[in-house]
């Protein structure tokens, strides 16, 4: 199953799942509520208090945990849940300004050799993240119109997020 995740500074989003605030709380005991994720002996709940801006999102586990929430939401939204091991391919993005320096580390952060076991809303998930592909964030939006963009000498793609704005300048695309 291919799952695309936008790890925004304000929200984490997938194609079909609900957007979630980029904030998470960790607890050793099960907190009250329905939207509880258990992973590695700890419990996690989403928080309205977003994670402060991080240039490098791989410095701790929080964006990985947010990704588990997003993966579970996307699996459910697509009606693709199975109790067996679910192979997952991730498509992730980085701001164009950070892509060259961080894309390899971002891929390593998500890719796992072993299955990942977690529960969300008291349902057990067994996933194996097989492949991880990282793309410049603004380019994902442009990919939908590459044919049209190839007819102009240059195009400026803007990605306006909750707290940031990124751009990507495309020059002289060749339509094949």
Describe every region a protein language model picked out.
Residues 160-166, 176:
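Ser/Thr-glycine-rich phosphate-binding loops at phosphate-binding pockets of nucleotides
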Residues 1-157, 172-174:
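Nucleotide/phosphate-binding catalytic cleft detector across ATP-hydrolyzing
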């Amino acid at each position: 199953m291919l799952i695309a995740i936008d790890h925004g500074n304000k929200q984490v989003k997938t194609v079909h799942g609900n957007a979630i605030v980029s904030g998470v709380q960790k607890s050793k005991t099960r907190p009250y509520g329905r939207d509880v994720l258990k992973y590695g002996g700890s419990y996690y709940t989403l928080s309205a208090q977003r994670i402060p801006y991080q240039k490098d999102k791989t410095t701790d586990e929080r964006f990985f945990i947010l990704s588990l929430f997003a993966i579970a939401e996307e699996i459910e939204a697509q009606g693709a849940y199975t109790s067996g091991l679910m192979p997952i391919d991730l498509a992730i993005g980085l701001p164009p300004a950070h892509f060259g320096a961080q894309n390899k580390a971002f891929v390593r952060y998500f890719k796992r050799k072993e299955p990942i076991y977690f529960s969300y809303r008291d349902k057990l998930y067994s996933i194996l993240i097989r492949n991880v592909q990282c793309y410049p964030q603004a380019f994902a939006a442009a990919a939908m119109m590459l044919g049209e963009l190839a007819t102009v000498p240059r195009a400026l793609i803007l990605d306006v997020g909750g707290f940031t704005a990124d751009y990507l300048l495309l020059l002289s695309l060749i339509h094949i």
